[in-house]
Amino acid sequence: MKVREILVTSALPYANGDIHLGHLVEYIQTDIWVRSMKAQGHKVTYVCADDAHGTAIMLKAEDNGVTPEQQIANVQAAHEADFAKFLINFDNYHSTHSEENREFSELIYRRLRDTGHISTRDVEQLFDPEKQLFLADRFVKGTCPECAAPDQYGDNCEVCGTTYDATELKDPYSTLSNATPILKTSKHYFFDLPEFEQFLKDWTRSDNRLQVSVANKLQEWFDAGLTSWDISRDAPYFGFQIPDTPSDEPDKYFYVWLDAPVGYMASFKNLCDKRAGTDDALDFDHYWAQENEHKTEVYHFIGKDIVYFHALFWPAMLAGSELRTPTAVFAHGFLMVNGEKMSKSRGTFIKADTYAEHLHPEYLRYYFASKLSDKVEDINLDLEDFMQKVNSDLVGKVVNIASRSAGFLLKKYDGMLTDVCAEPSLLEDITKTGDEIAAAYENREFSRAMRLIMQCADKANEYIDEKKPWALAKVEGAEQEVQDVCSVAINIFRQLMVYLAPVLPELTANAKEFLNINDLSFASRNEWLLGHQINKFKPLMQRIDEKDVAAMVDASKASLTQVDAPTASQDDKMVAKNTAPAATPSSTEQADYIGIEDFAKVEMKVAHVIACSYVEGADKLLQFTLDVGEAQPRNVFSGIRKFYEPEQLLDKKVICVTNLAPRKMKFGISEGMILSSGDPKTQLTVVTLPDNCVIGDLLA
């Protein structure tokens, strides 16, 4: 077997908050993949870091009365503690606020600049006169310029789905101070992404670099046209200053998304320096130099919401600075809990440390593994199913094999297994299944791997049930058969531990002690324990108690109520502005009426939903393909994602406003608006029509 040299990363958690179960989907997925590849004999290095720059961190530190450096150090310590609880085994964990990251960020920038890929131009932005800083889109709210919905963020409307510039908002206000922002002009630095369009089109479709659905989504962005990427921010900002700026522009900083992916390189370089001169030494250039792209492998595991950065900006930056690009980028979906988005009020927005206080982390590792595939699909943590699956599969099937067999061997045979296997065909069958399991792990088809493993466990339990060693133990002269049956069962249990080791490292470590062995690598699955003595059996896993799950949910409600309570000093103005009741015109006052001729201008048609899907990179939008009775279906974006699963709206008849001017959005062209009712902050309901409504008919 050729030993592959592989570098693996997970997306960098932002140093501004706690790790929760939604984050852990990715880190558990990556850790399982890394452990499985190491178990198969490959040289795999797994690095990560905290994403430690940006305005949000600067403001959070200010709120907490500490320096940004203290803020990110405190958060990083908490992150590393949480990851350790869930057995995430990084080879190195670093920070983007590091000298290595500064060095590589400046190197990439200078190479891009010197080859003509960086330009500057003046940008008009909203500026908070009280805070004395330029406002990022998410720090501005106002009235949507398209549908007039109030309290919408500065980048897109949650009601109608329209994207816009923050300067287009009506009645804007700063979410930081409640002040009315003013317009100011500043020179910004741009990376010329369109210059790399052909390279990116080829790259995204070559060598299985991306999942098919991701490549298809990127094609939509190509069709809409790539735009230059703003890579600069103005002071005050926590991050790295852009080098070599003119003397009249001293306070320009790299935008956080420029140096964040560079953090992968920085963490790896930090590890290379730590290991220099040791037997485990690593050569940075061997993995990142352009000429070594086909000698080593680099894989990024990410969430589907940051595909745009990792599959467009990042490879273009690397190619433009003459560094190697990733071998592949693997995207995953989001976590739902009990079929819905994680909810603070329902106690299903569960922090990592809250979970670990009540339940064993390996329960979650197994459950996630049983749900994860190579697809970009959301997974659902159904708490009832979670309890049943763990108790049934791990306790009732796997651990039960050892517990029901070890007692006979320890009591009557001093823990000795037989010298000859009584059922070689059964063990050979389970050994052969290991090839399928190994392939499933490598292909990130973890749910398939878990199904195959449980099928092996079922065979073992069926064998034990058929042979009934508890009954044989009472039969005079059947001593050898009892030892034979239990020895076969223990050997199957050992094979299952080989297969489950990437998912359940703590369980398998305890199993090694019980089995009196040192090796559970994939290569060892061909080895049988013959004439071997096992140690005393201790319970390896406890059943999940429903009370513990309930306590975890209750604790999540309590802790998040405390964390989310706003302070009066910051939020009173905001609450006053946003919750004051609107004045109601008296009968003698003139309201803002429109004439019938104005309403008649709005064209609304019966539309049939023929396709509905999530929008990569947009956590509020759903994308619809609508038949409105025209020659071609229409593409429409709607900001209702948090209220619906796409499949809930398939084949429905809805109302579409069809004579709105097409709107160019980041994700494509929106050719209409779907009507909904309700409060966009709490619940929107799509207005649906009876089946007997005719597609394309006008509403009047």
Swiss-Prot record:
<dbReference type="InterPro" id="IPR023458">
    <property type="entry name" value="Met-tRNA_ligase_1"/>
</dbReference>
<dbReference type="Pfam" id="PF08264">
    <property type="entry name" value="Anticodon_1"/>
</dbReference>
<keyword id="KW-0479">Metal-binding</keyword>
<keyword id="KW-0963">Cytoplasm</keyword>
<dbReference type="InterPro" id="IPR013155">
    <property type="entry name" value="M/V/L/I-tRNA-synth_anticd-bd"/>
</dbReference>
<dbReference type="InterPro" id="IPR001412">
    <property type="entry name" value="aa-tRNA-synth_I_CS"/>
</dbReference>
<dbReference type="InterPro" id="IPR012340">
    <property type="entry name" value="NA-bd_OB-fold"/>
</dbReference>
<dbReference type="GO" id="GO:0005524">
    <property type="term" value="F:ATP binding"/>
</dbReference>
<dbReference type="GO" id="GO:0005829">
    <property type="term" value="C:cytosol"/>
</dbReference>
<dbReference type="InterPro" id="IPR014729">
    <property type="entry name" value="Rossmann-like_a/b/a_fold"/>
</dbReference>
<dbReference type="GO" id="GO:0046872">
    <property type="term" value="F:metal ion binding"/>
</dbReference>
<dbReference type="Pfam" id="PF01588">
    <property type="entry name" value="tRNA_bind"/>
</dbReference>
<dbReference type="InterPro" id="IPR002547">
    <property type="entry name" value="tRNA-bd_dom"/>
</dbReference>
<keyword id="KW-0862">Zinc</keyword>
<keyword id="KW-0067">ATP-binding</keyword>
<feature type="short sequence motif" description="'KMSKS' region">
    <location>
        <begin position="341"/>
        <end position="345"/>
    </location>
</feature>
<dbReference type="InterPro" id="IPR009080">
    <property type="entry name" value="tRNAsynth_Ia_anticodon-bd"/>
</dbReference>
<feature type="binding site">
    <location>
        <position position="344"/>
    </location>
    <ligand>
        <name>ATP</name>
    </ligand>
</feature>
<keyword id="KW-0030">Aminoacyl-tRNA synthetase</keyword>
<feature type="binding site">
    <location>
        <position position="157"/>
    </location>
    <ligand>
        <name>Zn(2+)</name>
    </ligand>
</feature>
<keyword id="KW-0694">RNA-binding</keyword>
<dbReference type="InterPro" id="IPR004495">
    <property type="entry name" value="Met-tRNA-synth_bsu_C"/>
</dbReference>
<dbReference type="GO" id="GO:0006431">
    <property type="term" value="P:methionyl-tRNA aminoacylation"/>
</dbReference>
<feature type="binding site">
    <location>
        <position position="147"/>
    </location>
    <ligand>
        <name>Zn(2+)</name>
    </ligand>
</feature>
<keyword id="KW-0648">Protein biosynthesis</keyword>
<keyword id="KW-0820">tRNA-binding</keyword>
<feature type="domain" description="tRNA-binding">
    <location>
        <begin position="598"/>
        <end position="700"/>
    </location>
</feature>
<feature type="binding site">
    <location>
        <position position="144"/>
    </location>
    <ligand>
        <name>Zn(2+)</name>
    </ligand>
</feature>
<dbReference type="InterPro" id="IPR015413">
    <property type="entry name" value="Methionyl/Leucyl_tRNA_Synth"/>
</dbReference>
<keyword id="KW-0547">Nucleotide-binding</keyword>
<dbReference type="InterPro" id="IPR033911">
    <property type="entry name" value="MetRS_core"/>
</dbReference>
<dbReference type="GO" id="GO:0000049">
    <property type="term" value="F:tRNA binding"/>
</dbReference>
<feature type="binding site">
    <location>
        <position position="160"/>
    </location>
    <ligand>
        <name>Zn(2+)</name>
    </ligand>
</feature>
<comment type="subunit">
    <text>Homodimer.</text>
</comment>
<comment type="similarity">
    <text>Belongs to the class-I aminoacyl-tRNA synthetase family. MetG type 1 subfamily.</text>
</comment>
<dbReference type="GO" id="GO:0004825">
    <property type="term" value="F:methionine-tRNA ligase activity"/>
</dbReference>
<keyword id="KW-0436">Ligase</keyword>
<dbReference type="InterPro" id="IPR029038">
    <property type="entry name" value="MetRS_Zn"/>
</dbReference>
<protein>
    <recommendedName>
        <fullName>Methionine--tRNA ligase</fullName>
        <ecNumber>6.1.1.10</ecNumber>
    </recommendedName>
</protein>
<dbReference type="Pfam" id="PF09334">
    <property type="entry name" value="tRNA-synt_1g"/>
</dbReference>
<feature type="short sequence motif" description="'HIGH' region">
    <location>
        <begin position="13"/>
        <end position="23"/>
    </location>
</feature>
<dbReference type="InterPro" id="IPR041872">
    <property type="entry name" value="Anticodon_Met"/>
</dbReference>
